[in-house]
């Protein structure tokens, strides 16, 4: 999948959140990293069609995505979303959380929706949890079910906004292992993350976003090994100094 961003800007009233963001590359898996408040989540939501830019253009595989609601609805149906908060419906079981959107949003018949959900629960070691409600599940299980729900529609692109930031370390590993497996299957993913090990080792490419702009981007392993900008060098030194 090729994604091109041309001079994307986003302002909230007088606050500049993104300023002339330009990017073009073929992606399979890409991590967006950078300090808090740099515009990472805003950029992810614009790519997903959840938020309109103040100005700029976006192209997916050479086709311009016009920022009107009719086109954005079509665009969003090809994308799976996972956010920091797990977003499961508390009054529904895990099975219902995965199955019902397939039926009511995507028009899949009930038997096919159940079959799809069961396959995902079995694949990701969640079969024993499918009849439980969210309050009966660990944070890691809830987030993995959120990811299962997002990929149940067989999206062309999966967007994840800090999916592990609210999790304990052992649950973080569960979620990252699941994402690694999906990436190995060839699912296109863009993830906003503070997990530098995952960004370096599991994502093919990386974008470093700071002060509302993309400062650096490229191959993950090379970028982490030899950052070109002082900002990224300083950021990585601060992040990695306390790592085991």
Segments (PLM) and residue ranges:
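Helix-to-loop junction immediately C-terminal to a conserved catalytic motif
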Residues: 48
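Conserved ABC ATPase "signature" region
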Residues: 110-128
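Conserved ABC ATPase signature
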Residues: 133-137, 141
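A short, proline-enriched helix->beta-strand linker immediately N-terminal to the Walker B motif
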Residues: 152-156
